């Protein structure tokens, strides 16, 4: 999940750069929203990843 948050963050940054340079001025507002949305998602997922630890292994007991 953290992988996808990073991918979408990069896409939002690239879209923002194109939008601010005038190539796609209509996409500027959308790029701003996406940028901040994915920054928040990145921070939340990073905190969950750091605080979550590793889950305990599941032990299957066969009768």
From Swiss-Prot:
The keyword Disulfide bond does not apply. The chain crosses the membrane at residues 4-24, 33-53. It is found in: Cell membrane. The keyword Transport does not apply. Keywords: Cell membrane, Membrane, Transmembrane, Transmembrane helix. It is a multi-pass membrane protein. GO terms for cellular component: plasma membrane. It comes from the Bacteria. Pfam families: DUF1328. Belongs to the UPF0391 family. This is UPF0391 membrane protein lpg2415. It comes from Legionella pneumophila subsp. pneumophila (strain Philadelphia 1 / ATCC 33152 / DSM 7513).
